[in-house]
Amino acid sequence: MKFEKIAFVATEMPEAEAARKALSRRYGDAKPEEADVIVALGGDGLMLQTMHQHMKRRIPIYGMNRGSVGFLMNEYRDDNLTERLAAAECATIHPLRMRASLADGSCHEALAINEVALFRETYQAAKIRISIDGKTRMEELVCDGVLVATPAGSTAYNLSAQGPIVPIDAALLALTPISAFRPRRWRGALLSHRAQLRFEILEAEKRPVSAVADHTEFRQVREVEVEEDGSIDMLMLFDPDHGLEERIITEQFLY
């Protein structure tokens, strides 16, 4: 695929900003809203931010690592960028849609590329009832929290919480507890990407819980619904032989 107009975005870190200026001089710099590809210079945080900002445009985004964490980024090189973009492999990502009902009666929605997570707000453990497709699957999970991760997000917080790594082309979501106290041996579940999840907060006034979709947080939630939004396609570009699928496989053999 050949791209005519490239837009460069970068973090405020000196290394990233210097790379943006150098690449802009060499390849030109279109406005993001006029470009047909965006090159993000930074770490995974910038990649997620850029994907959120342009989520509904279906514009391909190619990341190059000028940050600290670069799982979603390609290696930085200033040579042959147009050729790299033309040869890049594309991964299509669908976000999670979270609907949160709060203690004050209000309802809010947010989208997540990596995960939707529920956390206890105080020293009291959270108590959460979990339903899948309208059927209660766990009457009471006593925990620090619980999360739902996409395949793209399964190597992020989900992995740190001992959740499974999910291949990028698997039509699955990972449901993972965070420091489960009861049932102590429950390690979560793999669910169809079409699953509709509902989390009900038990003893909510005594045990307040917040809900976070990537970087969007709502506090004192009473109920949270989560499902994949298949109507939104996000396109990520990766160098051949170093695509997201390969990275996820490699991650499973690190020790």
From Swiss-Prot:
Primary site of residence: cytoplasm
Pfam families to which the protein is assigned, alphabetical: NAD_kinase, NAD_kinase_C
Catalytic activity: NAD(+) + ATP = ADP + NADP(+) + H(+)
Record flagged with keyword NAD: yes
E.C. numbers: 2.7.1.23
The protein's name in its UniProt record: NAD kinase
Membrane-spanning parts: none
GO terms for cellular component: cytoplasm
A Gene Ontology biological process term: NADP biosynthetic process
GO molecular function: ATP binding; metal ion binding; NAD binding; NAD+ kinase activity
Family assignment from sequence similarity: Belongs to the NAD kinase family.
Cofactor names: a divalent metal cation
Location relative to the cell: Cytoplasm
Keywords: ATP-binding, Cytoplasm, Kinase, NAD, NADP, Nucleotide-binding, Transferase
Active site: D44
Its job: Involved in the regulation of the intracellular balance of NAD and NADP, and is a key enzyme in the biosynthesis of NADP. Catalyzes specifically the phosphorylation on 2'-hydroxyl of the adenosine moiety of NAD to yield NADP.
Keyword field contains Kinase: yes
